[in-house]
Amino acid sequence: MKIGPVVSLALLFGLGITPLAQAQVSTPLFIAADMVRGPGGSGPGCVLSNQFMRKEEVAWRIRVQDATGKELDEKGLKSVVVEMSDGQKFPARFGGHPPKAPTAYIWSTAWVIPADYPTGSFNYKVVATALDGTTTTWEPINTKPTLLTIVAGTFEPPAK
């Protein structure tokens, strides 16, 4: 008769630990990202592009979803950062776009290419950090036509 209470106790103990272990498993994230020309560039703003001149603004638009497809905002993630192959990091912010009359709420960040930045193709990645500290990384396909490309020339905005 002593086996019954021992088995019951072991079963209850096991059931109590199982949910704890499941709670520690991180949820996979899905990242979708693109690059567009920032406002005031050599072409229309917010249009997909991967070729930019120096002094132009590169803008990244990013969506992060959990395993159920739910969009994650600043309350659902610790951070979203674009990391360049040269080590530069650009933290993204969550907000409405376009700013004056939002039609989408996304993560975004931008970078004005320095006048002395080298030309060529450069890899980058997007790193999303979940609230539990786990990270998910997205990178574009590693072929020159899809990478950030700095072309010869320097953009000079028109005088106002």
List PLM regions with ranges.
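Short beta-strand elements
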Residues: 132-160
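Beta-strand-rich domain onsets/edges
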Residues: 23-59, 63-65, 152-160
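Bacterial N-terminal signal peptides that target proteins for export
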Residues: 1-9
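Internal, hydrophobic beta-strand segments that form the core of beta-sheet-rich folds
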Residues: 114-142
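Short flexible loop/turn segments that cap and initiate beta-strands
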Residues: 52, 65-93
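Short structured motifs
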Residues: 44-48, 89-96, 106-112
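Aromatic sugar-binding surface patches on proteins
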Residues: 99-112, 118, 122
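Bacterial N-terminal signal peptides
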Residues: 8-16
